[in-house]
């Protein structure tokens, strides 16, 4: 089965930097660790293409949409970041048989979204190595064309694998395929074995991509300084909607309106209405909440039609020439 590997370079770099710095091994081991990690990934499966994506060194295009985007990010001053960036640049230049994608104003998850979209159009699957949970909205599967997108990462010494909801249906369909082409059959078996090995070794989380996107739109994202769609000041602090509160709002939506469609023109209005009911505030607050939901959607949504045209054009041009 034709499958691509997408490696979030910022994820593997930061994971190694902090671990090596803690053990006073940064200068002697960073480059070796990066090389060994990519080598290990290459051996996982005969991937059609391997991509390494990185955030731009410049501000993201999202800063123009929301000027406080990622404003709370601070680098550890004890780490020699000049050395880290120099080492990482040399590592990227020396990579063989890996397509490196990085461009001004474009973030790693923008590249991941684009690669996945292009691959899925022609029936190619993707394995993403990242701890960026915005990527959860891209985890899905299809029978025609036939593909699946999964994500894996390691946090706190625990490796997780994120499968799209009901992925077993996809695997069962893959197993049942009758194909006279013995090479394609073998490819399918190899891919099934890879996913089975993941399932045996790693902690599995099942992801509903639409719910994953909406949960972040409702609750915001503190790590990126994206505010909650609704907040109230208590004891001098803004109290927004947390993960559990957002989950409760989505459950109420499904109970009242049925399964969620991102194409529903009344989606955000109905969510805002439920927020008003949950928080026991007047309906006059709906318009303000909808504006906040729309802002968060414009920042978090990784569907390509949500990207500014100039950004999408830059991504497309770089992708074609890499």
Sequence positions of predicted segments:
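Domain-level signal for Mg2+-assisted phosphodiester chemistry and nucleotide/NA-binding surfaces
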Residues: 1-95
């Amino acid at each position: 089965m034709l499958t691509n590997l997408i490696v979030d370079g910022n994820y593997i770099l930061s994971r190694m930097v902090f671990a090596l710095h803690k053990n006073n091994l940064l200068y002697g081991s960073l480059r070796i660790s990066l090389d060994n990690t990519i080598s290990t990934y290459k051996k996982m499966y005969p991937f059609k293409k391997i991509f390494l994506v990185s955030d731009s060194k410049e501000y993201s295009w999202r800063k123009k949409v929301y000027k406080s985007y990622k404003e709370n990010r601070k680098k550890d001053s004890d780490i020699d970041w000049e050395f880290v960036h120099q080492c990482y640049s040399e590592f990227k230049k020396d990579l063989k048989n890996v397509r490196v994608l990085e461009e001004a104003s474009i973030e790693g998850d923008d590249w991941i979204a684009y690669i996945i979209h292009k691959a899925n159009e022609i029936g190619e699957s993707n394995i993403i190595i990242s701890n960026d949970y915005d990527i959860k909205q891209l985890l899905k599967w299809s029978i025609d064309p036939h593909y699946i997108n999964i994500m894996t990462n390691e946090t706190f010494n625990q490796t997780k694998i994120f499968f799209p909801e009901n992925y077993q249906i996809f695997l069962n369909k893959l197993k049942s395929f009758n194909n006279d082409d013995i090479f394609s059959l073998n490819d399918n078996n190899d891919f099934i074995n890879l996913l089975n090995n993941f399932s045996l070794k790693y902690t599995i989380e099942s992801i509903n991509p639409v719910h994953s996107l909406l949960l972040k739109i409702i609750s915001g994202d503190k790590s990126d300084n994206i505010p909650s769609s609704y907040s109230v000041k208590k004891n001098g602090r803004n109290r927004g909607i947390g993960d559990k509160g957002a989950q409760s709002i989505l459950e109420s939506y499904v109970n009242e309106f049925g399964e969620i469609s991102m194409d529903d023109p009344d989606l955000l209005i109905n969510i805002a209405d439920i927020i008003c009911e949950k928080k026991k505030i007047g309906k006059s607050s709906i318009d303000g909440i909808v504006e906040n939901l729309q802002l968060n959607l414009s920042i978090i949504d990784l569907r390509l039609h949500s990207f500014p045209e100039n950004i999408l054009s830059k991504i497309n041009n770089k992708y074609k020439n890499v």
